[in-house]
Amino acid sequence: MAKGSHNSSVARPKPKAATVFEQDSDGSDTRSLQLDSGSELGSDMGESADEEEEEEEEEEEEEEEEQPKYAQFMDDSDLEDATDDESEDENEDDVEHGAYSIEEADSDDEQDDLRQQMNKLPFSALMKAKQQMNGFSSDDDQDVFSEPDISDLEEDEFAQDRQRLAAAKAGKRPDCKSNGSSNSSRSEEALEQKRLEVRERLRQLKGGSTSTVGSSSKGAADEAWAEARKQREQRRKDANQRKELAKRSNKNAPTEISSKRPVSRRRNVIETASSQVRDPRFESLSGSVNKDLFAKSYSFLPEMFKDELGTLKKTLTKLKKLEAAQAGPKAKSEQALAIREERAKVEAALRRAEGLAGERERRARESAVKGKIKSQNKERVEKGLLPFYPKKSEIKQMLLKDKYDRLSGGGNQEGKRASGQEKKQLKKALERRRKKNAQKEKRDMPAGIGFAREGNGALPKRKRNTAGGDSNKRARF
């Protein structure tokens, strides 16, 4: 059987010689194929054909050896043994594959943990570590290296706030202070553990430099670590104090700020109280108006007004004499103009003072008349009679009568005779009253008596309205 197969293999026709391509063994980027020359192809053609025939014969012989020689020696036990061997081989392959997959999963978990830790680190810390590694590779002769600042590798100060916010959003925010304190302690412990891991990793990244550093450098590193930790704690305390200052006990309370904060140029450092003008007549702080009490409290004011009036009169007299000495009122010298201007100011002040004095005198007379009416009503009530409340017109007549009595000297309460000044004032008042009444009589009496063109009598130009209505209104024609 083997011989037949061997003869058949020998009797096969030889394959045609094909063009041989050799790939560049250098593994260049271009992956180019090099074509051999014609002389090399002719010499190698026969050798390649013989080698192919020998390889085919060897393969056929191996296949024949593997197959059983006689079919009568093949039984069920041999088949079972073959299947058992195949199953064992498959089980071994599965075990090896499972072990490999477990190791692969563990390595993937470690890579994920490492990636998460690296993601939590700030970018500045990674850049600093990279700079340190570049420095170590560039300078090999340096024996002692300064340890990097681990404070830059710490987690962001607001990471805890972000975690708390995320927990509140997820509905896991702690309600009591004990839970908050325990969570904060746990987070601090985890943060401390993470810092230690980062520190150890930095030492490993430095390589053999840590072995050369002695105990003194290690102690200095520990001191630097403790100092950085103190600084972090101080920053946290300052942040907590700022938060406490920002809080207010009440929404209407003023905002508290730190005194260490510099004052801006736009804000007033010391706010002065602004002066507010207050009129005591319209303020409730001054109480109700009491004219008698006011007159008693400020009884010195009338004397001051009289002195001021006398001073103004004397000043006006002096200015008139000076103006006459400077060539009369038509003089145009600077001194004469200044005197004339000062005289005008004094005259205006004198008129104003005299008007205020007359107004005060009128109010005093009116208050005296009203006080007299009030005392009379009080006596009437004591006698059992009804009080008498006069009209405004009656009060006006009473004031006029009191004025003439006082000017004439007959109605003076002290019984003194009127002075020459009062007599002059009385004459002026009577003259004004006479002119006023005469003008009123001229307006009421018929004027312009003459003869009419057609009639026999004269018609007055104006006449009183006797038909009715308001008697005070004039009749219009």
Swiss-Prot record:
Residue stretches of biased makeup (Polar residues): 1-10
Cellular compartments per GO CC: 90S preribosome; nucleolus
Annotated Basic and acidic residues bias: 186-203, 226-247, 353-369, 414-424
Protein name listed in UniProt: rRNA biogenesis protein RRP36
Coiled coil, from the record: 185-253, 333-361
Function: Component of the 90S pre-ribosome involved in the maturation of rRNAs. Required for early cleavages of the pre-RNAs in the 40S ribosomal subunit maturation pathway.
Location of the protein in the cell: Nucleus, Nucleolus
Subunit: Associates with 90S and pre-40S pre-ribosomal particles.
GO BP field: maturation of SSU-rRNA from tricistronic rRNA transcript (SSU-rRNA, 5.8S rRNA, LSU-rRNA)
Similarity field: Belongs to the RRP36 family.
Regions of compositional bias (Basic residues) in chain numbering: 425-437
Organism: Mycosarcoma maydis
Region (Disordered): 1-286, 353-377, 403-477
Domain of life: Eukaryota
Gene: RRP36
Biased composition (Acidic residues): 47-66, 75-95, 103-112, 138-158
Record keywords, A-Z: Coiled coil, Nucleus, Ribonucleoprotein, Ribosome biogenesis, rRNA processing
Major location category of this protein: nucleus
